[in-house]
C-alpha cells in the first residue's frame, strides 16, 4: 500500500514458503479459529466490510475486513492507528508462498496511543513480533 506521507515509516513485510497446500493455509488465515491458532483470539468473519475485534495485549482492537480474494488475498484495518494488514498467498503446488504486509505507519516520532510509544519504537517491536508470528506460529499451525 502506498504511503500518503513521504516521512512515514515503511511497511513491515514478511514472506515465507509454507510446506502446506494453499487451501490449508487459506483456512488458517481466513477463519476465526485459524487466526486464533497463530495470531490472536478474535471474532473474525470472512466478509468484506465485516467489523471484528482482535484481543491484543492492549485490549480489544477494532478491525474491519477491507478485501477478500479467496484463496489468495485478505486485508483488514487493524485498530485505530490507520494500520492495514494484508495476507497474500501464492499456490506453489504442495507448498504455499505467504506474504504479510503491515502498512499504514505514521511518522517515526508520532506517538501510538494504546502503546504510548513513538511509532518508530512500536514498528520495531512489531517487526520482530511479526517475524516470530509468521515464521514460527503460522508455520506450526499449517505444517503440523
UniProtKB/Swiss-Prot annotation:
The residue range of the signal peptide is: none
InterPro entries according to UniProt? ASHA1/2-like_C, START-like_dom_sf
By its UniProt entry, which SUPFAM superfamilies does this protein fall under? Bet v1-like
Q: Which residues form a coiled coil?
A: none
- Specify the superkingdom: Bacteria
> What family is it from?
Belongs to the AHA1 family.
Q: What is this protein called?
A: Uncharacterized protein YndB
Natural source organism: Bacillus subtilis (strain 168)
Name the lineage. Bacteria, Bacillati, Bacillota, Bacilli, Bacillales
